[in-house]
Structure formats: C-alpha cells, structure tokens
Amino acid sequence: MDINQNLGNLMKEAQKMQQRMQEAQQQLSQLVVSGESGGGMVTIKMNGRHDVTEVKIKPTLMDEDIEMLEDLIAAAVNDAVRKIEKASKEKISQLTAGLNIPTDLMGGKEGE
C-alpha cells in the first residue's frame, strides 16, 4: 500500500472518528449519574457536562456539624465526577476500538 493510499485511508478514518466523537459527546451530555456519600445521606446528580443538577441532603444532617456536611457534599460531588469520567473513558474506548488506522503511520510497525 503506498503512502497516498495510506493517507487517504487515514483521512477517512479521521472523519469517521470526528463524527463518532460528536455523537459520543451528545450521548455523554445526556448521561446523568448519582454520586453519594455518608451512606446516601447526601446525593448529587450530575450530567455528562459535569453540571450538578440536583443536591439531596437528608434532613437529619441539618442538625449536624457544618464541616461534616461540607465534607459529605464534596465527597458526593467527587463520586459523581469519577462516575462521569469512567463513563467517558468507556465511551472513548468503544469509539476507538473499530478504527483501522495503519500503525506504520502512527510511529509503530504493522502488527504491533
């Protein structure tokens, strides 16, 4: 296969990847996860754009130490962020799994 044919194939694959990435971003923006802390005492809902869309706090926590409540909120947000990041990585892995990019153009050797 000559270099022009390889480059043509690479461009086609890049266009497919760009379209897939746009579709994935759309799907991920609609994803909603829940992050929890304190055994469900604090629950955060977050979408794929990392926007917090809902915060639920059990009423019994309102009588507790404010620092504990702050820590629980931070932990719930961090839990939601980790879930979004995991979902994003899984989606990207799915997208790149089917791509046919010649490894000799990527700095490796064919078959690596």
Swiss-Prot record:
Gene3D superfamilies: Nucleoid-associated protein YbaB-like domain. Binds to DNA and alters its conformation. May be involved in regulation of gene expression, nucleoid organization and DNA protection. Its main location: cytoplasm. Keywords: Cytoplasm, DNA-binding. One of its GO terms (molecular function) is DNA binding. This is Nucleoid-associated protein LPC_3038. Homodimer. It comes from the Bacteria. It is found in: Cytoplasm, Nucleoid. Belongs to the YbaB/EbfC family. One of its GO terms (cellular component) is cytosol.
